[in-house]
Amino acid sequence: AVAYVIGYFINGLSSLLDKTYYKTMGGMPSDILLTQIEGQNYTGYKRVKFYEASEAIEILKIELNDSNASKGKMFGRAMSYSNDDEKTRVPDFNAQYAFSRVILTTSLLLSILWLSKYYMEWWMWLVAVFIVYMSWRRCKERGYYYAREVLTAYLRKKRNANTH
């Protein structure tokens, strides 16, 4: 029961730190996936790419009847479609992102505790930086995978609706 309560509070803390994490990642993955770059046929970053951004943006703006729709508004609409379908992998990707965010928060907390006690040990700094970096990188990737899956599920649902 104690582990559950601790996990519950770490999950809450990780939710509070979400905006800070996004700043270190260069922005929200959903915003970056919905931002086209001139001369590039994909959005995202080197490890997680989304090749259907222009199609998704076009369909979302038409559906929202708003040629200046914000990225948040577009992603919110895509989420409403993908969450409405139990055949998608979106809940799995969401859970993986939430879990990796909790792991990142836990690694930060543990590093602070370790380094406050062993601040004179140079190797502890290396271990802490390595663990936090790996957790941060994994969290970033999972955020992009989740956002890409939401947009992919949205496009799949729209395409299926147009063929029936």
Each language-model region and where it sits:
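Short hydrophobic alpha-helical transmembrane segments
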Residues: A3-Y4, T105-L113, W125, V129, ...
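Transmembrane alpha-helical hairpins and terminal membrane-anchor modules
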Residues: K117, W122-C139
